[in-house]
C-alpha cells in the first residue's frame, strides 16, 4: 500500500486503518503524529536525528534473511491498494490483483514493441543498414510522478524495470 506523502496525519491514519497495514516505512516527518499506532512497526528512512528512536531502514534490511520463503500466490490475489484523491470524503482504497497489474504491463510492452517495429520499418524502407560499432542510445525516463499513484508505479516504475530502461528519480 503506497500512501500519499502529501496527506495530513488524519488521512494517513485513515489509510493505515483502512488498509490494515502492519509496517510503515517513511521519513521522520511522515511518521510524526502516528504514535497511537502502537501495533504498527514503524521504520524510518533518511533519519535526521531519529529522536523517537525508530528502527532505521538500513537495520530493517540487514536483519532480513538472505532468501525469501516461498509464498503461495494466485494471479487473482490482491496485490496493491491505491487510494483515490478523496474528493468526496476520505480517499477510497482501490484494489488491483496480480493479474490486473501484469495484464496492464504486458499490454503496454506489446504496444510499445509494435510501435517501435512499425516506426523502424517505415524509417528503414529502402535503406541498407550497416553497423559501424557506434554506441546505441539507451532508453531512459525522468521519473517525476509519485509512486503512490498508479501512473508513477505502473507506467513509470514497473514498465521501466520490464523495458530495462534507466530511471532517474526526482
Region spans (language model):
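Conserved S/T- and glycine-rich ATP-binding loop of Class I adenylate-forming
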Residues: 24, 78, 84-87, 101, ...
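Conserved AMP-binding/adenylation subdomain of ANL enzymes
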Residues: 102-143, 148-170
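Active-site loop-to-helix junction immediately N-terminal to the catalytic Tyr of the SDR YXXXK motif
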Residues: 96-97, 156
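Short beta-strand->loop structural element characteristic of the AMP-binding/adenylate-forming
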Residues: 1-23, 92-95, 166-170
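Conserved pre-ATP/AMP-binding loop-to-beta segment of ANL
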Residues: 65-83, 90, 116-120, 131-140
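ANL superfamily adenylate-forming
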Residues: 29-75, 90, 99-102
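Conserved helix-loop-beta element of the AMP-binding
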Residues: 20-23, 38-51, 135, 139-142, ...
